Amino acid sequence: MKISILGGGGTRTPLLLKGLLSLEEELELEELSFMDMDEQRLLLVKRVLDEIAKEGKGKLRLTYTQDIRESIREASFVICAIRVGGERLRIIDERVPLRFGVFGQETTGPGGFSMAVRTIPRVWEITNLLAEVNPKAWFINFTNPSGVVTQAILGYSSLKKVVGICDAPSSIHKVIAQFLNKKEEEVFTDYFGLNHFGWIKGVYVDGEDVLPSILELIKDLPDFERITRFPGEFSALIKMLPNPYLYYYYFKEEATKDLLRAERTRGEIVEEMNAKLFHSLREGSNPLSIYLDYIKEREASFMPGRLKGIALAEGEGYIDVALKVIKGLAKGDAEVAIVNTRNLTAISGLEEDDVVEVPTLFRKDFLRPLSAGKIPAESLAMLKQLKEYERLLIEGVATSSYSTLLHALTLNPWVPSYHIAKKILDAFIEEEQEYFPHPG
């Protein structure tokens, strides 16, 4: 089997390789092709990858290329993890909304909007090429904003063998299992929503829903609010555990004030860490040690505190989901993972072709989202608004329509008014004009 990794110079790529090595014999892996347009970055990450590869059986070939056709040809799976515009434009995504008192974040809100406008056309180019060169391959999308990008692929390309992956739900599952002192496979999290916009409405152990007990425990647990920023009583109020990104929706004012007080955005922190990593890889003699130090620093910067006894490594959620998906689709053993896929009938009240984030069953070359059952009316109303925003955003990109993009941004839950939406959009056009249509 051959697997292609687009964006192979990314900082999570070594973690992905480590995970794939654990399935080297089971999947009969023969080649991993790492493709990246940034040759220098790819060659520096190659130093780390070559060291990690020594842990394998020695039969797996690692190849490196800037030729996307070469990389995707004959691959069974194509993993897409690109960042159009790099960290520089991520920072602009975060900073522009703040000028107008609106929270900026790279995957949701106006920041995610801008990232989607830049990213979707490039992903369409890739998927159109894949449909021409290797239409039988499965396309696994890591590229953010994952849900919107996956929706754009399934709605506007001929590819149907597409899965979108985000680490948030699987990371929540891991934390819950550790909190309950259970193995991950002993716990089922009844999750529903969209990417970075979902809830856990049940946690099942031995057939019993233990979520009510969890909500009661965390209500008076100081560490819970310190780590998640959600007051324990809030989860008890909605009777669900919210995805951490829902903090930006339920607590917009607090989230915006926190970021306005901060000296640097998340993108600026990551940019500095990445620059330090690549400088050290260029100058240092022990690439694997340098990389592991980087991962520890990034992990600590993202989650400075933890619940006692609970640990989660940087990137661990992404890799575990990817391995489950690949193993299930390739081998046929039943696997269940929370991914972004077509709704079908999983969430009643949304359209069949809406991309949702739900537990999904994987078998050989087959997937089927599991039914979410009855969900709260308030959640469905929020999902419908965000889904309409996503549809208009993708339509605006497809038609290069300023007015449609403005309509979409006006519907974004983070944006308080039409006038603010217009100011933000016009500012993005000024800062990132090569990616945006102009008015008129």
What role is predicted for each listed range?
Residues L27-D50:
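NAD(P)-binding Rossmann-fold cofactor-contacting core
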Residues I3-E28, L32:
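N-terminal Rossmann-like dinucleotide-binding module
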Residues I126-G207:
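Internal, well-ordered domain-core segments that constitute the primary functional module
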Residues R88-Y156:
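Rossmann-fold NAD(P)-binding glycine/threonine-rich loop
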Residues K54-T63, E185:
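A short helix-to-beta-strand connector/capping loop
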Residues S76, R83, N144:
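Short glycine-/small-residue-rich Rossmann-like dinucleotide-binding loops
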Residues R61-E74:
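Short acidic low-complexity segments
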Residues N181-G440:
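Long, compositionally biased stretches enriched for glycine and/or charged residues
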